[in-house]
Swiss-Prot record:
Amino acid composition bias (Basic and acidic residues), ranges on this chain: 24-34
Protein's recorded name: Protein MgtT
Miscellaneous field: This gene lies just downstream of mgtS on the same strand in another reading frame and is encoded antisense of the mgrR small regulatory RNA gene.
Induction annotation: Expressed in both exponential and stationary phase in rich medium; expression is higher in exponential phase (at protein level).
Any single Pfam family the record assigns to this protein: MgtT
Lineage: Bacteria, Pseudomonadati, Pseudomonadota, Gammaproteobacteria, Enterobacterales
Highest taxon in the source lineage: Bacteria
Organism: Escherichia coli (strain K12)
Residue ranges of the region described as Disordered: 1-34
């Protein structure tokens, strides 16, 4: 929410890393992130 780098880069890597889990992680607590 600061620049255009961490915004499209963060969700892109997460989506490819966890796939559909990315959307679930946004609503759920950062369990896989930690």
């Amino acid at each position: 929410m600061n620049g255009d780098n961490p915004s499209p880069n963060r969700p892109l890597v997460t989506v490819v890393y966890k796939g559909p889990d990315f959307y679930d992680g946004e609503k759920k607590p950062p369990v896989n992130r930690r």
